[in-house]
Amino acid sequence: MLLIPAIDLKDGQCVRLKQGDMDQATVFSEDPAAMARHWVNQGARRLHLVDLNGAFVGKPRNEAAIKAIIAEVGDEIPVQLGGGIRDLNTIERWLDDGLSYVIIGTAAVKNPGFLKDACAAFGGHIIVGLDAKDGKVATDGWSKLTGHEVADLARKYEDYGVESIIYTDIGRDGMLQGINIDATVKLARSMSIPVIASGGLSNMADIDQLCAVEGEGVEGVICGRAIYSGDLNFAAAQAHADKLGAE
């Protein structure tokens, strides 16, 4: 089980939001590259970056911070980025800059043709981010709820060659209420694309539950507020997951 620290970027700083609300941002570091180094030193094997400003305006914003992170750790572990990625030129530029994966969210829902083109052009590098509340997909930085069922949409992406799907339960994100295991497993079982869980990870019990369903197609989990607030020790959690995985 891959535990993936999240570095959410707003105005060049590393922050955490509550339920995607830009007005409820807690700044954890003014040096995102140093934060990236910290998580790698703690045993992270991949990093998850979110360009929050980019997600809201639909084009890259925090470019200096992202490039600094890639320069700091990009040669050591894969780095993935979501937020504001809505055209092929942006994908190409980020991959050329050293990102391993780009995450397409809103654009994958609104423009499946774009997702198909992206997978064809950059196979193996495209992750889809599906954000949902009560099983329904949300877009535009979670500000709009669609009528799409998560599983229906995800199954359509199987033929495209999507690398994995990050499934976020937005009702739980940043609230430390525990991962929605049932919804995550249900999605993973419904298709062949591996799922990365997100939203609400809070303690070792969540890690135990996730490791128990790894065989169902849940390959990782995004770690956010819990590893910043101290509720979860990242190094201990990854070591624990590795131990469970070896049993």
Swiss-Prot record:
It catalyses: 1-(5-phospho-beta-D-ribosyl)-5-[(5-phospho-beta-D-ribosylamino)methylideneamino]imidazole-4-carboxamide = 5-[(5-phospho-1-deoxy-D-ribulos-1-ylimino)methylamino]-1-(5-phospho-beta-D-ribosyl)imidazole-4-carboxamide. It is found in: Cytoplasm. Its EC number is 5.3.1.16. GO terms for biological process: L-histidine biosynthetic process; L-tryptophan biosynthetic process. The keyword Isomerase applies. GO terms for cellular component: cytoplasm. It is an enzyme of class 5 (isomerase). It comes from the Bacteria. The active site is at residues 8, 131. The keyword Cytoplasm applies. Keywords: Amino-acid biosynthesis, Cytoplasm, Histidine biosynthesis, Isomerase. Its main location: cytoplasm. Pathway: Amino-acid biosynthesis; L-histidine biosynthesis; L-histidine from 5-phospho-alpha-D-ribose 1-diphosphate: step 4/9. Pfam families: His_biosynth. GO terms for molecular function: 1-(5-phosphoribosyl)-5-[(5-phosphoribosylamino)methylideneamino]imidazole-4-carboxamide isomerase activity. Belongs to the HisA/HisF family. This is 1-(5-phosphoribosyl)-5-[(5-phosphoribosylamino)methylideneamino] imidazole-4-carboxamide isomerase.
